[in-house]
Amino acid sequence: MSRRNATSFVDNNTLTSSGISGSGSMSPPITSRPASGQASPLTSNGSLSPPQYADDQGSVSYNLDSPRDLSPLLLSELACLNMREVVARPGLGTIGRQIPVKSNFFAMDLKNPKMVVIQYHVEIHHPGCRKLDKDEMRIIFWKAVSDHPNIFHNKFALAYDGAHQLYTVARLEFPDDQGSVRLDCEASLPKDNRDRTRCAISIQNVGPVLLEMQRTRTNNLDERVLTPIQILDIICRQSLTCPLLKNSANFYTWKSSCYRIPTAAGQALDLEGGKEMWTGFFSSAHIASNYRPLLNIDVAHTAFYKTRITVLQFMCDVLNERTSKPNRNNPRGPGGPGGPGGYRGGRGGGRGGSYGNFGNRGPPGANVRDDFGGNGLTFTMDTLSRDTQLSSFETRIFGDAIRGMKIRAAHRPNAIRVYKVNSLQLPADKLMFQGIDEEGRQVVCSVADYFSEKYGPLKYPKLPCLHVGPPTRNIFLPMEHCLIDSPQKYNKKMSEKQTSAIIKAAAVDATQREDRIKQLAAQASFGTDPFLKEFGVAVSSQMIQTTARVIQPPPIMFGGNNRSVNPVVFPKDGSWTMDNQTLYMPATCRSYSMIALVDPRDQTSLQTFCQSLTMKATAMGMNFPRWPDLVKYGRSKEDVCTLFTEIADEYRVTNTVCDCIIVVLQSKNSDIYMTVKEQSDIVHGIMSQCVLMKNVSRPTPATCANIVLKLNMKMGGINSRIVADKITNKYLVDQPTMVVGIDVTHPTQAEMRMNMPSVAAIVANVDLLPQSYGANVKVQKKCRESVVYLLDAIRERIITFYRHTKQKPARIIVYRDGVSEGQFSEVLREEIQSIRTACLAIAEDFRPPITYIVVQKRHHARIFCKYQNDMVGKAKNVPPGTTVDTGIVSPEGFDFYLCSHYGVQGTSRPARYHVLLDECKFTADEIQSITYGMCHTYGRCTRSVSIPTPVYYADLVATRARCHVKRKLGLADNNDCDTNSRSSTLASLLNVRTGSGKGKKSYAPSVDDESYSLSDATSDQILQDCVSVATDFKSRMYFI
């Protein structure tokens, strides 16, 4: 199926140079000029990738090759930058159609506006050395309250946060009028190996606190006083967290959400695999306009482990979910059994236990399933027998699932003890340990024999034991004597099916969500809450109402090659159509190849797909080859690496260029997908596009159009642009503007134990529209929010902008994602200084004004239309462009809510924007219009998106880079790592320097300091190399 002869489609051999067209270089692909009648907005000759231009700005000289040394005067100026002042709101926005809306905030009224509460510091002392969780500290505290009525006269006049803070309506009377007291109590804690534990509580008087909301008023980010609103937050949660109230036993509190514990079947959504979805409500106190306290209430959904089930039932649920069908697509294959002493077996094999071989198959005829993950059997409690044992594959699956969970040991009557599971071990009849008999002699016996003597014979002696408790102690329990501790939140990664089930259950239309929130507020019974009553706090039963404005969307311009249609289209309900339109600036694909990870007998479908794709690309104005030059078949991720190398070598031999490799996947497989992207982005520097076989077999025009949109952008083209209005023309067109998107992704708790770093992505436009973007990626120490190496990235982005447009940016607009309000001061101070330093490092007089905007997506504010006529779509959401800057916004600073997308499913979540720095002096209308316009430039679809495009792209880049790092660290999607391998993963190389200094515990696999010692610089460089894409890719949109 080469362009010369379609019958050569299945030929895997190297084609001759005559069968591949190209210029013979590996330079970026050629991009065509704009459609006829349109001048190029980038350069005079229409090129998207101009050469390195000489400076034509007159007196300004740019140091583009190396950073310049800053003078002492400039360094002093940078040190004195004031990044602490809050940007004042420049006024309220006025443009747009006004509509009345409601939001899920409820007014809070204080009986005494200047009420004073007494603050105390609480320390809880436990005789053991373990750390207490908040649930345990609440049990101990409230038990002390019950045991000492002479100190706590009114238990409802207390507000305890579950840690170290206590607030009271009146001063507590301590003996001898002391400022502190130590109280003893006996509490029943499930994790202790006794019925009751004697604990002590130290309470120290800190002083009075004035509950006046305007105490938070300050123009300095570092001086904001949050205590009053935090106290109201604690007070509102007391009824559901105080164990002295019977109703609290029906709820479980996790951070700011309270979930109702299911008490009967059907009250929770079954997610399979021993998990279920609980429903609860989120609540958080805020200070809004005019310093009015509001309570934000929202519906909350999350996954928990099933309640009241045994570990055996949990095992059945997990294995039935993961091994219900023969695992023929398992990329690891069956592998071998686990090796002794905890080392892995063959590739894909089970992991051995700490004391021997997991993979023992047992005698012939034993009730054991094959290593491929199942033979059609289903695990149930009825099918388990004395001879039941697990295969090495099943052992690995269940071991990964139960590791880290809390279980209850129930082998002792009337004594329930809670343990944390470290790992699975050998079956009970084979796991041996040393003990002392009644006569004081040392004996060696199996766990099965020990339990048989002490508590009766085991029903399932061939099932693995659980290693629980401190990792250094040998505490082993048979699974049949264990229960799943509940309530217990599920914190691991869920499968796509489970995630989809939660989204489907939670995605209700706006009117239904509004009703649910009202029901939750009513069920909370704030009107009869004894704690609120004692503190003099009242919560309204009605949602806050305010006025919103619906901003008009910008028109969208396509190419003008098709004169029969108007190239300008107008979005309606957040979307627009490309019918009969051509790309605004189509790119040229000179040649491409294909890797098909499907059956070679599907050749006909692949041929049809290639024809359909070429026809659609041509119709959209893109020059695209009729057939791929090379087509190669494979099955596994190892084949992907081999085939990428073969294709690159063949083009290199023929001195031609491959602009893109299309990879056809049989089904979604993240491991194979990331192998493709690693080979594409880092190893070979050839653009790639993955397509699922189900889309290849049915290449509809819409499917082909979506693929063309991605390919065009990856090869340097522009799909469409917004038509500049007065505001956009002033700030984005008349003067060159660089729009930057920054996002930082952090590792999960499981990934942190494997030394997974944080990943920062910096994206900025390389044209004047802005539509085309380049990206930089930086890795840094885990969980640090501010971007450490931002200076280098911004400097490179400015230089790239200049070389592509021949103009320096006259202003810089930064959209920053993922920053909480408590981090505003730190991030703003460090990142603005880095951006300013990057500008001065290029030229001393290069000082473009900077506007820095934080974009927040993870909040619980929702906006509902008051009248049905204003609702849009089946989900009855607010219309795209809905903007709110009154009523529910902050009383200080410059923030607003903007719902820029059309909610197809569920209730739309508006994005919240905080303008932390505005040297460009935007008005409210200007910044809101520009932000809304930037939500219409996302190239992968013909819809407006929920956040500005630069931030969206930064998130894509960070996600891609994070996957590259995980692959190098040997982490799979479930965050499992081969901790016994010392040379196969980067984690072992980084163990010495990452997280092990200054008394911190290192969680990486242990290595010998002398043989593996690396400097911090070397560690950082290794991590950076993991995400360093090909040089040409840094100014191209490879991440689309």
Swiss-Prot record:
A GO term for molecular function: single-stranded RNA binding
InterPro entries per UniProt: ArgoL1, ArgoL2, Argonaute_Mid_dom, Argonaute_N, PAZ_dom, PAZ_dom_sf, Piwi, Piwi_ago-like
Polar residues: bias regions: 1-15, 33-50
Residue intervals of the PAZ domain: 379-486
Domain spans labelled Piwi: 660-966
GO cellular component, one term: cytoplasm
Region (Disordered) residue spans: 1-61, 322-367
Matching SUPFAM superfamilies: PAZ domain, Ribonuclease H-like
Low complexity composition bias: residue spans: 16-32
GO biological process: regulatory ncRNA-mediated post-transcriptional gene silencing; spermatogenesis
Annotated Gly residues bias: 333-356
SMART domains in UniProt: DUF1785, Piwi
Protein name as annotated: Putative protein tag-76
